[in-house]
């Protein structure tokens, strides 16, 4: 048979390639319950570890893609290839999902990296590029024009990318710490709690960070104006490369269905409630601080809205499961903002504690947090409204009218 979309399916960077292949045994039951996992090497390996003859697994062609040209995406053909079963028969999907979850986290971090590098380049360009005068009057009167970083919309694009990078880093590092505890903590109960939280956050890391990466790289290309569209400047490559992150290792729609359908409604909101309690505890601790009101008040308000929204969607889904599909993508983005708001509030707390230190690091953190709460978090109001609009506006159009 053949497999398509195999990343790095053929290359000469290592002596051997080990392909993990999902396949069906001759007597396997139908459907996903009959899929097994096999290890299929490019070269057969001897008992002593030495490489032997070529296995019957070949690259039949390369995909011609929009981006990620540094990765050979292959069409792989297997005809009589020799493979070794991994795990038990007919339980290949369960084994594969161990790797899929790690890959999804990796895609989120990949998106985060593209967000950061695009931001860093755009900042340098915006400080150097002269164009127009500020609407309020010249900011660099000694120059023929002002640097474009003085213009409000350029600032908005740069700050959006910066906020998505900083919020994304906080989420990625927090999730990595949870994984460390899940794997290594001596207390089994703590390991279980961390595993549950990682399960909840994984689709958010993958989908929210990759959605944000697409937005951020597009904004940063826009900062360059026409030069951003020119290949030699490098910005358009970040945009092209970021687009795949919303598609592979499970599309972001699949991530949203996983979050809402399995991770939230699947356990009657137990995982989400645990995370919500962390937010509630933080809000209670910091609610007495006047300086923290601009952060904890909208955080608490959004937490309450997510709780109510989840209940409403759950009740609709009980009547018609398609309601989950209608709300899931917007719901994940709301949850992503809730998580970011929590981390930005925590970062703001630390920054406020060091505000008199004179360190620009803390001043920048506080400013970024304020931008996020003022300019990005309000997106949730519209998303919640579209979630509540439900299934009917999507499905009432007769198929023949498309």
What are these regions (language model features)?
Residues 2-5, 151-222:
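Gly/Pro-rich turn-and-neighbor structural signature
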């Amino acid at each position: 048979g053949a497999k398509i979309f195999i990343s790095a399916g053929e290359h000469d960077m290592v002596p051997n390639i080990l392909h993990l292949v999902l396949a069906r045994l001759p007597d396997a039951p139908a459907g996903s319950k009959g899929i097994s996992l096999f290890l299929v090497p490019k070269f057969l390996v001897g008992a002593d570890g030495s490489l032997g003859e070529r296995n019957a697994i070949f690259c039949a062609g390369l995909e011609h893609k929009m981006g990620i040209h540094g990765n050979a995406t292959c069409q792989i053909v297997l005809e009589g290839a020799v493979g070794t079963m991994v795990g038990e028969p007919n339980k290949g999907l369960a084994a594969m999902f161990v790797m899929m979850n790690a890959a999804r986290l990796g895609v989120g971090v990949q998106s985060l990296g593209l967000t950061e590098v695009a931001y860093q380049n755009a900042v340098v360009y915006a400080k150097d590029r002269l164009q127009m005068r500020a609407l309020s009057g010249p900011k660099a009167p000694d120059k023929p024009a002002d640097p474009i970083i003085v213009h409000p919309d350029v600032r908005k694009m740069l700050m959006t990318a910066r906020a998505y990078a900083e919020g994304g880093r906080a989420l990625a590092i927090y999730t990595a710490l949870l994984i460390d505890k899940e794997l290594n903590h001596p207390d089994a109960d703590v390991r279980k709690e961390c595993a549950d939280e990682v399960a909840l956050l994984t689709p958010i890391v993958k989908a929210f960070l990759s959605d944000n990466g697409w937005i951020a790289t597009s904004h940063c290309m826009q900062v360059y104006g026409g030069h951003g569209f020119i290949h030699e400047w490098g910005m358009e490559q970040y945009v092209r490369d970021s687009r795949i992150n919303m598609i592979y290792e499970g599309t972001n729609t699949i991530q949203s269905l996983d979050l809402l359908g399995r991770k939230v409604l699947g356990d009657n909101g137990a995982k989400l409630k645990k995370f919500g309690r962390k937010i509630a505890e933080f809000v209670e601790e910091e609610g007495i601080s006047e300086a923290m009101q601009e952060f904890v008040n909208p955080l608490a308000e959004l937490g309450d809205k997510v709780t109510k929204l989840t209940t409403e969607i759950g009740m609709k889904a009980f009547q018609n499961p398609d309601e989950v599909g209608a709300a899931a993508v917007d719901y994940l983005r709301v949850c992503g903002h809730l998580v970011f708001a929590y981390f930005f509030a925590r970062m703001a707390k630390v920054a406020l504690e060091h505000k008199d230190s004179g360190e620009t690091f803390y001043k920048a953190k506080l400013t970024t947090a304020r931008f996020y709460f003022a300019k990005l978090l309000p997106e949730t109001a519209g998303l919640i409204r579209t979630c509540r609009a439900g299934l009917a506006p999507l499905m009432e159009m007769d198929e023949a009218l498309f």
